[in-house]
């Protein structure tokens, strides 16, 4: 049986090869063999093991099976594996800053990472967000990135101002970020409506 560090290393090597358009057959076989030693009935691992040693295996089929194996093992890439995801979250924060300025608030917020967690989080001028942060894969999709960054920014800002931000101008209640019709929006729950797209908060609304 592999140690936890060796297991993580194999998962990462396999993932990085898939990311770069190939399949590390050695990592694929070793990882699947370890899973089969623990659970001989693991069909995903059995398929990868068979394809990894077959010289005539269809590369696309092997890649798909390897991705399925990693998914079944709940492997989650980090920002080290996908630095572009952190860049995407940084870009999303720039969009959210426009809403702070529209409400007359400082845009002195930043994205940071910390030891012991794979996630990123938002730090405002007087407080950090209090949740678990933003998971790396949120940066994979622009809309998801914007929603997650908006939520974390909202948490940090509300702990900085000790009040709801932003607020629906019609219902005078706090709104929350969500995806709606393929866009990241500020949504008023009680009113059941979109107040504004994230990054486009009207200046007259505070």
Model region roles, listed by residue range:
Residues 2-144:
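Long, charged N-terminal interaction/targeting segments
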Residues 125-206:
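Cys/His-clustered metal-coordination modules, chiefly Zn-binding fingers
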